[in-house]
């Protein structure tokens, strides 16, 4: 039985309908997590509109707000919500806040090498593994696999930690969600992208790392998580879209839209495409999860305000 709320028949997600006179260039600056998805969207959009060009710079979510403030980007992909300070900085310059659209769902996964027999982790264990400060109630540092009950010879050594760098939205959100805004251990090997984290974990039987689930490969396994070992929650479409999985999150596109005025035609049509059946099919293609229909309809309404 589905755990997702239904949407009224008059509010079904529409197909995208091609419009005349769409041309120009979209500049995207922001999230590495959304880099592949932005590429998929741009490629499909260009098949509809051959005279549209894209420039995509994916250096991390923290680069999106300054680029939108300065006008060097038309769209800012982000894997986390805007901080209050980022909204204030934008509003100070433009006189109104940016429009933030939810465009996909993802989860920050805890990956281990695919043969690792660990059944799952409690949230306190996650804190003990990754955090120096353990603000989430970790019961002491967990530095060796034996502390998690693994007795196999392959897991007699220390746990090797992998994660993202500080400019990443994934880093910032995991810090809040998993570490209760505590500090990471200095033994976390920081990587420039989620793909690098997954590759590192897949290449090392004693490794564990956090990364965007959309970058999962056959070489890794995403661990179930829970408050206790008796209620581990697997990472799948239902638990992410229903927000039961502890580290579920939305992915966003942020734009500069003046209240009461329409976006320029090119930006408006690209966002309408993203928030259509065809755009959400690309979300699935990239390994992420489409947003619920009720959420998507609300995002389309934001474009009309």
Model-found features: residue ranges?
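Flexible loop/hinge segments at secondary-structure junctions
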Residues: 4-305
């Amino acid at each position: 039985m589905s755990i997702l709320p239904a949407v009224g028949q008059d509010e079904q997600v529409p197909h995208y309908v091609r419009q005349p006179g769409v041309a120009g260039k979209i500049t995207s600056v922001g999230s590495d997590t959304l880099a592949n998805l932005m590429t998929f969207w741009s490629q499909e959009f260009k098949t509809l509109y051959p005279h549209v060009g894209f420039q995509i710079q994916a250096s991390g979510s923290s680069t999106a707000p300054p680029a939108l403030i300065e006008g060097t980007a038309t769209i800012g992909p982000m894997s986390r919500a805007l901080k209050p300070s980022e909204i204030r900085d934008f509003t100070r310059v433009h006189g109104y806040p940016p429009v933030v659209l939810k465009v996909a769902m993802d989860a920050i996964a805890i990956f281990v090498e695919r043969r690792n027999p660990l059944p799952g982790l409690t949230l306190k264990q996650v804190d003990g593994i990754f955090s120096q400060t353990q603000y989430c109630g970790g019961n002491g540092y967990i530095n060796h696999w034996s502390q998690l009950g693994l007795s196999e010879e392959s897991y007699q050594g220390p746990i090797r930690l992998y994660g993202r760098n500080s400019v990443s939205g994934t880093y910032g959100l995991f810090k809040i969600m998993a570490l209760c805004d505590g500090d990471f251990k200095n033994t976390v090997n920081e990587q420039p992208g989620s793909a690098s984290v997954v590759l590192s974990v897949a290449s090392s039987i004693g490794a564990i790392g956090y990364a965007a689930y959309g970058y999962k490969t056959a070489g890794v396994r995403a661990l179930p998580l829970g408050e206790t070992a008796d209620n581990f929650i697997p990472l799948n479409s239902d638990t992410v879209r229903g927000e039961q999985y502890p580290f579920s999150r939305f992915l966003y596109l942020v734009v500069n839209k003046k209240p009461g005025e329409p976006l320029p035609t090119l930006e408006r049509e690209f966002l309408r495409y993203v928030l259509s059946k065809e755009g959400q099919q690309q979300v699935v293609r990239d390994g992420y999860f489409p947003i619920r229909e009720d959420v998507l309809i609300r995002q389309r309404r934001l474009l009309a305000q």
